[in-house]
């Protein structure tokens, strides 16, 4: 085959761009007073995640509203999810105090979970693969916990950065470390979720691309691996929602008790 023919064949072959489905694209351009308020694919899929979470809970407990004795499978799944998050709150904040924050924490868990899982649908978009989304969620948790600590303890909140039992001479070193550690919380919380969602979905996209470009005879192994990895990504999506939720509870507990 001549060099020209090889070049033409290479040009005709489909190009792999595993990061293409992470691109934020404007769907409805909107600009007000020079501020870009466009509705993007990320916005739409976040709305869908909220809608799915709402419908999941509404349909799940429809049987209870109708006084049915035997719960449906959907209701059982919703009750398991409800109990699972409530146990996280009870273990990391405490029963009486934690229940006040349970609705917000449960909503946050469902939002992160469905944002993660909806991204596995072919042709969809994963909002939590965008650092601006995860950073917004993490900063919301951070500012809420910080505000809660200031309201509850006032100037006593400063004591959070002074480790107990540390010699006075070491406080010069330890206090700045504690402050930096505290300020890095939203960074670690957001980057962890963003990095895991981006990495996992990128590998999955590469596997499906190779499976689609191989002849039928060599298709089975990559397709099987991609299917198994999809199941693994479902697990990762759940685990990341769990980690985000449990760290939120830890930060709220620190704000309440200055641990």
Swiss-Prot record:
Ranges annotated as spanning the membrane: 37-57, 101-121, 131-151, 157-177, 203-223, 232-252
Localization in the cell: Cell inner membrane
One Gene Ontology CC term in the entry: proton-transporting ATP synthase complex
InterPro entries given in the database record: ATP_synth_F0_asu, ATP_synth_F0_asu_AS, ATP_synth_F0_asu_bact/mt, F0_ATP_A_sf
Database matches in Pfam families: ATP-synt_A
Taxonomy, superkingdom: Bacteria
Assembly mode: F-type ATPases have 2 components, CF(1) - the catalytic core - and CF(0) - the membrane proton channel. CF(1) has five subunits: alpha(3), beta(3), gamma(1), delta(1), epsilon(1). CF(0) has three main subunits: a(1), b(2) and c(9-12). The alpha and beta chains form an alternating ring which encloses part of the gamma chain. CF(1) is attached to CF(0) by a central stalk formed by the gamma and epsilon chains, while a peripheral stalk is formed by the delta and b chains.
Role description: Key component of the proton channel; it plays a direct role in the translocation of protons across the membrane.
Family: Belongs to the ATPase A chain family.
Protein name: ATP synthase subunit a
Species of the source: Magnetococcus marinus (strain ATCC BAA-1437 / JCM 17883 / MC-1)
Upper taxonomic lineage: Bacteria, Pseudomonadati, Pseudomonadota, Alphaproteobacteria, Magnetococcales
Gene name of the encoded protein: atpB
